[in-house]
């Protein structure tokens, strides 16, 4: 938390976490302004999109707390910086994580730039994460902080603070969102507060109920913001060309037909369309009713490969290679033993980091990792400190 009282623009999403964040900051004496971000044009999607109701909820929260709220449309920025990349990744056969890119490009870039124009000293969101000032490093270079339009200001801020900024996991391990924030830069962290990062979710709900916030009992949002509650395949079908092809098992036996490789992801169990197919002979694990999982996508031959059983060797990887690395400190960690997540909510897995050139790195695991998926993020940790990460390119 910031000891200095200053103007803080809070991203009010219409949910309980951002609402309590705004209230906590006002209690600390900050000048708090709410800002609701509209990141998707939903004019044709009334059945699925909840942004109108979310704004009404955010406005009600602002009224109860006694702060101003501004409505800002970042839909154009979102389409250019996030959604276009999302589609490119799916077209290439990978499974992207748009929430990671949205945080780096919209919630902590477009939002931050807008807040600075409003005279804010900092921004705040309802993410479950923490920011800590690290000890000063001798001869600390200024270079990594040039990534932001506010770079010059933030270099001075970091020098004043006596060191770099670290991104830490939220104290509530079950709600920690540092995985989605691993691409934030020093410039962004220098301007960011996470007021609920020090609290368990149960305490956030208790505070909201105690001060009678209208969203105290509102369910947490789920899914990708621009998809809402609609079936994922239905949504992608509007934007991606697709061609049906064979579904085969590891022996090359055709089991059915897929509707387009882009609609499937590694480790997927539901919606494959071969639920009634049994493995002939003794299946792995001794059960011919073991579920089928997507294991590989052969794009040159437009073939989807599936295997039976959660623990099938095709679903296990001891090594991954990643690219497009982004490091919180601005430079890669030293080679050696760390921990990593290859998907959200996964337990930290011990690994050995081997940094490479041009934003690439390799991770080697002592224990096989399940369904490591190209396009998803591999995020590295040193204890509670999130070091950054990259986009998974391949696994073996």
Swiss-Prot record:
Disulfide bonds: 102-225
GO CC annotations, alphabetized: cytoplasm
Family designation: Belongs to the MnmA/TRMU family.
GO terms (BP aspect): tRNA wobble position uridine thiolation
Source organism superkingdom: Bacteria
Chain positions covered by the region annotation Interaction with tRNA: 175-177, 343-344
Alphabetical list of Pfam families matching this protein: tRNA_Me_trans, tRNA_Me_trans_C, tRNA_Me_trans_M
Listed name of the protein: tRNA-specific 2-thiouridylase MnmA
Functional summary from the UniProt entry: Catalyzes the 2-thiolation of uridine at the wobble position (U34) of tRNA, leading to the formation of s(2)U34.
Active-site residue list: 102 (nucleophile), 225 (cysteine persulfide intermediate)
Cellular localisation: Cytoplasm
Binding residues annotated for ATP, in chain numbering: 11-18, 37, 126
């Amino acid at each position: 938390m910031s000891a200095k009282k200053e103007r803080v623009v809070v991203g009010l999403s219409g949910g309980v976490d951002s609402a309590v964040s705004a209230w906590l900051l006002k209690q600390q004496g900050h000048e708090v302004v709410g800002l609701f971000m509209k990141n998707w044009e939903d004019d044709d999607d009334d059945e699925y999109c909840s942004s109108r109701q979310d704004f009404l909820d955010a406005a009600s929260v602002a009224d109860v707390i006694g702060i101003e709220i501004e409505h800002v449309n970042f839909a154009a920025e979102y389409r250019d910086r996030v959604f276009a990349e999302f589609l490119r990744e799916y077209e290439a056969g990978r499974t992207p994580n748009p929430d990671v890119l949205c945080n780096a490009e919209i919630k902590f870039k477009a939002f931050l730039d807008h807040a600075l124009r409003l005279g804010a000293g900092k921004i705040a969101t309802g993410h479950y994460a923490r920011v800590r000032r690290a000890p000063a490093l001798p001869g600390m270079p200024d270079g990594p902080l040039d990534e932001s339009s506010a770079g010059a200001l933030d270099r001075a801020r970091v020098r004043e603070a006596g060191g770099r900024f670290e991104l830490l996991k939220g104290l509530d391990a079950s709600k920690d969102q540092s995985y989605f924030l691993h691409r934030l830069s020093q410039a962004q962290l220098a301007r960011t507060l996470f007021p609920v990062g020090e609290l368990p979710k149960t305490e956030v709900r208790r505070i909201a109920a105690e001060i009678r916030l209208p969203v105290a009992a509102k369910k947490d949002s789920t899914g990708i913001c621009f998809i809402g509650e609609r079936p994922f395949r239905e949504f992608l079908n509007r934007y991606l060309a697709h061609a049906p092809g064979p579904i085969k098992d590891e022996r090359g036996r055709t089991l059915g037909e897929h509707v387009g490789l882009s609609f499937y992801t590694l480790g997927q169990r539901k919606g494959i369309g071969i639920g009634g197919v049994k493995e002939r002979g003794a299946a792995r694990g001794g059960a011919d009713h073991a579920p089928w999982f997507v294991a590989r996508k052969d794009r040159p031959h437009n073939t989807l490969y599936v295997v039976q059983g959660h623990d099938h060797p095709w679903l296990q990887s001891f090594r991954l290679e990643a690219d497009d690395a982004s490091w919180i400190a601005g430079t890669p960690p030293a080679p050696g033993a760390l921990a990593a997540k290859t998907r959200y909510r996964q337990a930290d897995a011990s690994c050995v980091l081997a940094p490479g050139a041009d934003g690439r790195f390799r991770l080697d695991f002592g224990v096989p990792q399940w369904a490591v998926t190209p396009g998803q993020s591999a995020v590295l940790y040193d204890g509670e400190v999130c070091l950054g990460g990259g986009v998974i390119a391949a696994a073996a």
